[in-house]
Amino acid sequence: MDRRDRIRGAMIGCAAGDALGYPVEALSEATIIERYGLRGITDYDLDENGTARITADTQLMLLSANGILFAHTRGALRGIMAPVYQYFDGFYFDWYRVQTTERASRSRVGWISAYPSSSAQRALSPTSMRVFSSDKFGSMDEPVNDSKGSGCLLRAVPIGLSYSDDPAYILDLAANTAALTHGHKLAWISSGAFALLVSHIVHEELSIAEAVKKTLKALDNSFPDSLTVVHELMRSIRSAVSLASSASSDLDAIHSLGEGWVAKEALAIGLLSALRHENDIAGAMTFAANHGGNSNTTAAIAGMLVGARIGFSAIPDRFIDRLELVDVILELADDVTTDCPMSDWGPSNPVWEHKYTYCDYAYWRRRNPEAKEDPGKSK
């Protein structure tokens, strides 16, 4: 299995878990059983068009990946680049405009924004929406609120997919990205831990358990001004690891970790599910979706972790064929794998430029259907 297959698996697994858990988000467990049977939801609950819909969690994850590649392209072509998280505001605000005005700015900042499903109004995070409406993002130095919510977590996924050599950088970038909308240290540090888990699995080909050990070791030496919060998160992660090998029933294990509305709880539930079903993405996502809490986020985390571990080629077709935006997600995943193929002195690449410089790729592609794909992309 190559890195491309693992990155594809991570992004499709994330979206698939989100789509599986979305119809049962916040439903009581009794209601889930009443609607879907004793096993709960085990397959997509399709919309009227036969599509498994993603939510704002996946939408913002994709926009974050788009933002990283935009930043890298700017750095490659201009030789200078601001901190990566500082490029996200335009992508998030453009997405927010569609949520509130039904139309985005004339100058879209991300090529995926041309696809209506990338900004359809579904399972919006109240915390993020309040921040977007204020037109002012937070930072680790100036928190914008005191939210510990899990709405920041999936934005960490592309960070783990994009970086591998510097754990401290990954932790810091993911924490700064979370701090844009969530002001509590527990949200920041949970996002950092999640990004690092992703990186270890994808780039080092570690098992999920091995990735957890390395992540805990890195956490123990990070955020020295926030050790109380770090240790709180580490206890939650260790509880998930312990429960994964226990005789506890699925629901009892999940209940002991929380409902998933708080970042550390969502991460722990997703991790628990992935550890119990490391080679079975259907089992992991089903486990993580069938509880009376933040089902789409916990199932997305589980799907991402197992998808990264087993790769796209091992994900059952039933979770791919009907998934909303599947072709866009795969194309973006391949771009994450390739990263910017240009430099300020090398040849141009029209496909890449229209994605990550001009940001008009969908329009340009319609006018240039025969344009060649990126020659630097691994196939």
Where do the model's predicted regions map?
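Structured, active/binding-site neighborhoods that engage oxygen-rich ligands
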Residues: 1-379
